[in-house]
C-alpha cells in the first residue's frame, strides 16, 4: 500500500475537495501526451504537498494519471514521479529490458513497454502493456503452435517478413487440411482480467481455396469444453449471409498492416478455479479442397475491448 497520509494532509484534502465541487474536464486524445491544458491561475490543489498528490493518484490508472496532469501545475509536476509509474509496471519489468537500454524515468519506461513490444522467452512471445490500464498483452508466435503439415515444405514454408514481430512466419502453400492450435499459461497475463484472443494473419494476392471458407475456432481452458465459433480469412459479404446458424466473427485490418479475427475470450482468475492454461483451436471442418495464400503471425491475447 502507499504511504499513509498525516492529519494535516488529510485536512487539506478535505478543504480542497470541499472548495472544488466542480473540476474542469479535459479530453485526452493520446494518453501518452498527458491531459489537456493546465487550468490557468492558482488552484486549491496547489496547497497540497507533492508527495500527498503523488500518493493519491498512484491508486488510479495510467489514463487517470495523465488526465490529472491538467488539474493544476502541482498535479502536472507530481505525475512525473517514478513512484507512480513504477506501480503500473509489471513486477518482472527489469528482466524484460536489455541492460543497455537507458530510460530517463519510469514514465518513459512505461510508455516504451506500451509502444515498443519486447520479445520474451527466446522469441516465443511478444510482450507489451495496454496503454490506458497497464494490463499485460501477449502475442504468441506461430512457431509455438502445432500446425498440421507445418514441417512439410510442400504444405507450408517459413518465411521472413520485415513487418513481423518474429524471426519467421508460416505461409500456407498448398494443403487440403488446415488445422492448428496451441496453449499458453495464463501466468504471464494480468490477473482478474477478461481477455479477448485473436488470430493475426495476412492473405496474399495469389491465393485460392480461402474465399468464404468458414474456419472453426475456439478458446478455452485446458480440461474444459471449448466454445466454438467461426472466422473467415477471405470473406465476401454476400456469401456469408448463407451462414445463419454459424456465429461468424468479422475480421478487420490493423494499423500494423496485419489482419485479425477474434477467436474467443476468457477470464483470467490466475488458476483459482484450477485452470491456468488456455488452449486455442483453428480448424477447417468443411472443405477438403486445396488451399493456399495465408500467412500466420500468431495468437494475440489482450484485455477485452482494448483496441
Curated annotation (Swiss-Prot):
PROSITE patterns with a match to the protein in the record: FBOX (PS50181)
SUPFAM superfamilies: F-box domain
Gene Ontology molecular function, alphabetical: carbohydrate binding
InterPro entries: F-box-like_dom_sf (IPR036047), F-box_dom (IPR001810), PP2-like (IPR025886)
Domain F-box: 42-88
SMART domains found in the cross-reference section: FBOX
Entry-linked Pfam families: F-box, PP2
Protein name: Putative F-box protein PP2-B6
Source organism of this protein record: Arabidopsis thaliana
Amino acid at each position: 500500500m502507499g504511504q499513509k497520509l498525516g492529519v494535516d494532509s488529510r485536512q487539506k484534502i478535505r478543504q480542497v475537495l470541499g472548495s472544488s465541487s466542480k473540476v474542469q474536464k479535459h479530453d485526452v486524445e493520446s494518453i501518452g501526451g498527458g491531459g489537456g491544458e493546465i487550468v490557468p491561475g492558482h488552484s486549491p490543489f496547489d496547497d497540497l504537498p507533492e508527495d500527498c498528490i503523488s500518493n493519491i493518484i498512484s491508486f488510479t490508472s495510467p489514463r487517470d494519471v495523465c488526465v490529472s496532469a491538467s488539474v493544476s501545475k502541482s498535479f502536472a509536476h507530481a505525475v512525473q514521479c517514478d513512484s507512480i509509474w513504477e506501480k503500473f509496471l509489471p513486477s518482472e519489468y527489469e528482466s524484460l529490458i536489455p541492460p543497455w537500454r537507458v530510460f530517463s524515468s519510469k514514465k518513459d519506461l512505461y510508455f516504451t513497454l506500451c509502444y515498443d513490444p519486447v520479445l520474451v522467452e527466446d522469441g516465443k512471445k511478444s510482450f507489451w502493456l495496454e496503454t490506458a490500464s497497464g494490463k499485460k498483452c501477449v502475442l504468441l508466435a506461430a512457431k509455438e503452435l502445432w500446425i498440421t503439415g507445418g514441417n512439410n515444405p510442400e504444405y507450408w514454408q517459413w518465411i521472413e517478413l520485415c513487418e513481423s514481430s518474429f524471426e519467421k512466419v508460416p505461409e500456407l502453400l498448398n494443403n487440403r487440411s488446415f488445422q492448428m492450435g496451441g496453449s499458453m499459461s495464463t501466468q504471464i497475463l494480468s490477473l482478474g482480467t477478461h481477455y479477448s484472443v485473436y488470430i493475426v494473419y495476412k492473405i496474399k494476392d495469389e491465393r485460392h481455396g480461402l474465399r468464404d471458407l468458414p474456419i472453426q475456432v475456439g478458446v478455452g481452458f485446458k480440461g474444459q469444453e471449448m466454445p466454438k465459433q467461426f472466422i473467415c480469412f477471405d470473406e465476401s459479404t454476400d456469401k456469408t449471409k448463407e451462414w445463419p446458424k454459424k456465429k461468424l466473427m468479422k475480421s478487420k485490418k490493423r494499423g500494423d498492416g496485419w489482419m485479425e479475427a477474434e477467436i474467443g475470450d476468457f477470464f483470467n482468475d490466475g488458476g483459482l478455479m484450477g485452470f491456468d492454461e488456455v488452449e486455442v483451436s483453428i480448424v477447417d471442418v468443411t472443405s477438403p479442397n486445396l488451399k493456399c495464400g495465408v500467412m500466420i503471425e500468431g495468437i494475440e491475447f489482450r484485455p477485452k475491448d482494448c483496441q
